[in-house]
């Protein structure tokens, strides 16, 4: 159990059989009446965001989320299959669960998968990945590091904006949170 006074961003609670993550919280102490906590909660399973108010000191069941490191082994149809390298258990994620993160996922990559009651909730990719450029416009003599950017397609099919001097076959570091170019590898 967790008190509403102990809410922090990232705290996970269980409400009506669903797992919710606290996105924002604000402790309010009005001049008249009792204190309360105004929160913005995100459903970890569906991604829905709701605003909810709790009385100060109200206790709620905390959701125990287990984080396991798993390796992306292969893609079966549109499903992504991951394997725990210690127990050899497999977990499957749908394209909806993967979202935009699928475009940075390579076979053999290790990721963290979040479980609740043996159900797959979410996936956490590393903050950056090394990807190879498969298609981009050729660099022209005179292109500099301080110049503009151009679109490039990486081995996973994602489009990344890269500096003009980057060419096909080079390996670059990409931020998985926003898809930005971080540098050469």
Swiss-Prot record:
SUPFAM superfamilies to which the protein is assigned, alphabetical: Nucleic acid-binding proteins, Translation proteins SH3-like domain
GO cellular component, one term: cytoplasm
Alphabetical GO biological process terms: peptide biosynthetic process
Keywords noted in UniProt: Cytoplasm, Elongation factor, Protein biosynthesis
Gene3D superfamilies, per database record: 2.30.30.30, Nucleic acid-binding proteins
Location in or out of the cell: Cytoplasm
A Pfam family that the UniProt record links to this protein: EFP
Keyword NAD: no
Keyword 4Fe-4S: no
Pathway per the UniProt entry: Protein biosynthesis; polypeptide chain elongation
Principal location listed in the UniProt entry: cytoplasm
Alphabetized GO MF terms: translation elongation factor activity
Role noted for this protein: Involved in peptide bond synthesis. Stimulates efficient translation and peptide-bond synthesis on native or reconstituted 70S ribosomes in vitro. Probably functions indirectly by altering the affinity of the ribosome for aminoacyl-tRNA, thus increasing their reactivity as acceptors for peptidyl transferase.
Family in the record: Belongs to the elongation factor P family.
Protein name: Elongation factor P
Organism the protein comes from: Microcystis aeruginosa (strain NIES-843 / IAM M-2473)
Lineage, broadest ranks: Bacteria, Bacillati, Cyanobacteriota, Cyanophyceae, Oscillatoriophycideae
Gene name of this polypeptide: efp
């Amino acid at each position: 159990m967790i008190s509403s006074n102990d809410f922090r961003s990232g705290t996970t609670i269980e409400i009506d059989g669903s797992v919710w993550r606290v996105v924002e919280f604000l402790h309010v102490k009005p001049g008249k009446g009792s204190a309360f906590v105004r929160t913005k909660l995100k459903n970890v399973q569906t991604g829905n965001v709701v605003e909810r108010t709790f009385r100060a000191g109200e206790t709620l069941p905390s959701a125990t989320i287990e984080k396991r490191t798993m390796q992306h082994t292969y893609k079966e149809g549109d499903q992504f299959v991951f394997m725990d390298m210690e127990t050899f258990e497999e977990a499957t994620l749908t394209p909806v669960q993967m979202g935009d993160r699928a475009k940075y996922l390579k076979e053999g990559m290790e990721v963290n998968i979040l479980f609740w009651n043996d159900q797959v909730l979410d996936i956490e990719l590393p903050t950056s990945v090394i990807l190879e450029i498969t298609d981009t416009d050729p660099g022209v003599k005179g292109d500099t590091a301080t110049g503009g950017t151009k679109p490039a397609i990486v081995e996973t099919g994602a489009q990344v904006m890269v500096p003009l001097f980057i060419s096909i076959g080079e390996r670059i570091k990409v931020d998985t949170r926003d898809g930005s170019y971080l540098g050469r590898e």
